[in-house]
Amino acid sequence: MNRTARYATFVVLAHAAVVFWHLVLVAKITPGLTEHQVLAATTAINLVPTVALVLLWTHFLRLGGFLLFLPLAVGLIIGGSEHFVTPGPLNVFYMATTPWLLPFRVTAVLLLVLEVSGCWIAIQAFRRVPFLQAEAKQ
């Protein structure tokens, strides 16, 4: 079995679950997101990483690594800025005390860890020679 694909699968599935829960919490903290918008955003955020998983499992490591890296890096930059750097209603350090504060902080940190891990896995996948090319040379 492909170890890179296994690790990527864990990260992408965990990321999908945490993104959904995080967006539900965002909707509770800052009203404005409907249930349909949360579901649509979750689907959109996780579509490209899911395609990347299929590519990684079918031994297209470079393309799969690129498609895994791109959305996770964008999420890392935007989420890291929104939740840890820029002051605002969704910054974990400046949020008002609500019953959702601790779960929101936990999901923000989990997303940070999963996105960094996913980017690292994607870079490792991108640096490897795809299995199909290695078999063709033999």
What are these regions (language model features)?
Residues 96-117:
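Individual transmembrane alpha-helices with interfacial aromatic-anchor signatures
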Residues 1-16, 121-133, 138:
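Cytosolic juxtamembrane helix and N-cap/initiation of the first transmembrane helix
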Residues 18-29, 71-89:
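C-terminal TM-helix exit segments that contain a strictly Trp-centered aromatic cap at the helix terminus
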Residues 60-64:
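Membrane-helix interface segments
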Residues 20-38, 89-100:
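Membrane-interface interhelical loops and short amphipathic "cap" helices
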Residues 68-79, 108-115:
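Hydrophobic alpha-helical segments of small multi-pass membrane proteins
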